[in-house]
From Swiss-Prot:
GO terms for cellular component: nuclear replication fork; nucleus. Its EC number is 3.6.4.-. Residues 209-367 form the Helicase ATP-binding domain. Residues 31-44 have a biased composition (Low complexity). GO terms for molecular function: ATP binding; ATP-dependent DNA/DNA annealing activity; helicase activity; hydrolase activity. Residues 92-170 form the HARP domain. Keywords: Chromatin regulator, Hydrolase, Nucleus. One of its GO terms (biological process) is replication fork processing. It is an enzyme of class 3 (hydrolase). A motif (DESH box) lies at residues 316-319. It comes from Caenorhabditis elegans. This is SWI/SNF-related matrix-associated actin-dependent regulator of chromatin subfamily A-like protein 1 homolog. InterPro entries: HARP_dom (IPR010003), Helicase_ATP-bd (IPR014001), Helicase_C-like (IPR001650), P-loop_NTPase (IPR027417), SNF2-like_sf (IPR038718), SNF2/RAD54-like_C (IPR049730), SNF2_N (IPR000330). Residues 30-49 are annotated as: Disordered.
Amino acid sequence: MVLTDEQRQAIAKKREEAIRRAAAYREREMQAAANATASTSSAAPPAPPKPVIPVMFSQNRQNFQPMKPTMNNSTKQSTINNYIKQVQKPEPTSLIKPTIGVKLKLDIGDRIKIEFYPFHSAVIDLIKQVPSRNYDPAKRSWTVASSDHITISNILKNATAVKVELEPLPQNIIGLTNFKPKAAPSDLNTVMDPSLIERLFPYQKEGVIFALERDGRILLADEMGLGKSVQALTIARYYKADWPLLIVCPASVKGAWKKQLNTFFPIIHRIFIVDKSSDPLPDVCTSNTVAIMSYEQMVLKHDILKKEKYRTIIFDESHMLKDGKARRTKVATDLSKVALHVILLSGTPALSRPSELFTQIRLIDHKLFTNFHEFAIRYCDGKQGRFCFEAKGCTNSEELAAIMFKRLMIRRLKADVLKDLPEKRREVVYVSGPTIDARMDDLQKARADYEKVNSMERKHESLLEFYSLTGIVKAAAVCEHILENYFYPDAPPRKVLIFAHHQIVLDTIQVEVNKRKLGSIRIDGKTPSHRRTALCDSFQTDDNIRVAVLSITAAGVGITLTAASVVVFAEIHFNPGYLVQAEDRAHRVGQKDSVFVQYLIAKKTADDVMWNMVQQKLDVLGQVSLSSDTFRTADKMHLRFNDAAQPGIAEYLKKTPDTTIDEWEDPVEEKEDDDLEIICDSPAPKRIKN
């Protein structure tokens, strides 16, 4: 059918009308939405929209009209109700609760630290509801007693003024807040040999009691030189019913531990030192039996040790067990699970590297942290790295320290126990290392050359060559000892005087000090006299200068370096007067600290000969009072050394004729500690009184 022009015009008009009505419909919809939005600010809800009447087209395009909707009363009411539900009055902005993140942490002193962010006074008001709350203005932090853990948690959870997102303490830490030490005797003299106990300093007695309160499972982390080894032996002796005792230590200090036992426990006559795989272990379990071995031998004898079930074990230098994947750590862990008493010794606990503490903690209490992954996330900034899980950081360090001090660790710095220490302590340290071993043939040849020479002049020349070679060979081991024991990461700030004789030894020490980027001064024979005063002043006043590298002969007199409290002799000298004068650069008027003196000795070197020569030049032993880190007074000290050919350090440091009694007031001597070995074979003289 062909449309006429009139029909086409009519269709076009109707189409335009339909478009117009559709546009009008859309405009009404938009207006209704605008009215609904505007009405949200008024108290009354907006009027419901009128029902939409759809436009229906009939098949005949020439005639179209809207269809009337069919809607009864119930349908209308339902539509209105649905619309009212959709258009709700929003809560005013002023009534929205701020969200505050709150984190609970264990703090030192049986306290729980409360950290929150952002700051809101409402949280302060909540904390103040707890009677035990305390504010530390220095740390700007709030704490409550650990016994109020549940109380503060409930108060924060039920807060109304703010929305609290609470991060509570982990369950294992909550359990630790309830930890109660075991009852221990307040007077050790009632349960142990009084002659042993009276030799301990007060802080050492506290360390023993701390261990007994924890059933002999602790980490003894006192600073080097404070007598960890004698504390460990005293603790172990309390549990003699659970002997034989097993001591695992670095190979170089096995002899030192034996001497400690001979000194303090002469009744113990069955001491087994395991040097090689064929060496036997104790075949009977008695309270007078001790086995001493290196970590390497512990690994080799793992099966035998596990079968014997040692119930009291000392792990010396326990930071050697920091690697959980190392075989020695796995063996030590197996042994510690069977043992009743486990005593760890370390003067350098890695509190800023908590990942290294995990294995040591588990040796003492394997239930405290059962999972390294969880431990690392909370304390090591543990996270998934590009290739593996990484735990190299440090988080919540204060909480970890609080846990360790409460449950398993005791650590005292020299500054903490200064009142208990004598004015000056001396000790001999035997150093060893691959550089010494590698040159042992040369050293033995030099010694043989010295011994076979008859001419006094030639003998002196030969000794000087032997002395020089010894200094060169010792230098690397000396540097390693000084840096590892005094300038390790997190070491307490201290100043150290390092004395040597040969230029090559001084140079080696200077290079290693510079590598560590330690501020230092150097005074030797090449230092102009007018420069010495300025160098000494800078050492005394500049906190960034921590090391003085000094010549025994050139810097041993005429200068004051009392800012240092540690004196290390990398080499010794023929004349004991030079040694005493060098010590007194730090031990003199103006010194407010206890001076700690170390002599670094290498066995089978010229040092052996030098000690004998020093002894021959001394006249009397009298005016030197001795005091070890295990004895409170010199009068009670009687150290013996099995090798009669090896003279004691007490004999080397006798008073020289031109030394006044006042200058020698209270000089003291200290026996071996940890990897240190004292060699004394004479009873202590009486202390000189003014």
